A protein has these predicted regions:
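Conserved small/polar residues in nucleotide/adenosyl-binding loops
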Residues: 170-175
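Short coil/turn connectors between adjacent alpha-helices in alpha-solenoid helical repeat scaffolds
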Residues: 36-46, 80-90, 124-137, 167-169
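A conserved position within tetratricopeptide repeats
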Residues: 14, 58-65, 99-103, 149-150
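Active-site-surrounding "flap" and adjacent substrate/cofactor-binding loops of secreted or lumenal enzymes
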Residues: 25, 29-58
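Amphipathic alpha-helical repeat scaffolds of TPR domains
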Residues: 21-34, 64-82, 108-128, 153-164
């Protein structure tokens, strides 16, 4: 979640393993939109470096595992302005791709975290309706994260994003439900 360090780490990884696609995927992920950048209305990929990185990952996709290839294709949707020019529609398409990956790989902690992040980028800290009830996808994301947490507490992304979901529990009509 510290993007400058993540970018430096992925750049270093791409130097040591230039033919593996995942360092480039990581660069694109770190350079791209995230819940905080969307909330602050920062421009997406203003210098085009994220697009360049995801295209580099795509050009090396033959070196990826099947799950890595699916993650690369999913993230490409977020950058593919030629196919979907509207930012909000691209966000929704990326969320749909991550929702599907989470459905297919419910025990994969990184996919659960990426699904949550995709949802939070769209929600921009708005996960509850005007009456304090969680929106439908808020519960689905919470359940995906909690499914992972039931057996594995080692993924910091899962834990971090779960905290963001429950930090707003005070607006819920039944906060005790979240504390169980």
């Amino acid at each position: 979640f510290y993007f400058p360090e993540a970018i430096l780490s992925y750049q270093t990884a791409s130097h040591y393993d230039p033919e593996h696609p995942m360092p480039y995927w990581g660069l694109a992920h770190a350079m791209g939109p995230n819940p905080n950048s969307r909330y602050a209305r920062m421009p997406d990929d203003p210098k085009g470096e994220g697009l360049k990185a995801i295209n580099s990952a795509l050009s090396r996709i033959q070196n990826a595992t099947p799950i890595e290839a699916e993650l690369i294709r999913a993230l490409h949707v977020l950058y593919d302005k030629e196919s979907i020019s509207d930012d909000a529609k691209r966000d929704q398409a990326y969320l749909a791709a991550m929702r599907e990956l989470n459905r297919r790989y419910p025990d994969h902690s990184d996919i659960a975290a990426l699904y949550a992040s995709a949802y939070m980028s769209i929600g921009r800290w708005d996960y509850w309706d005007s009456e304090g009830n969680p929106k439908a996808e808020t519960m689905a994301v919470a359940e995906a994260l909690e499914h992972i947490m039931a057996t594995d507490l080692s993924n910091p992304g899962v834990l971090h994003l779960h905290i963001h979901l429950i930090c707003l529990l005070y607006t819920s009509p039944s906060p005790r439900d979240w504390l169980q």
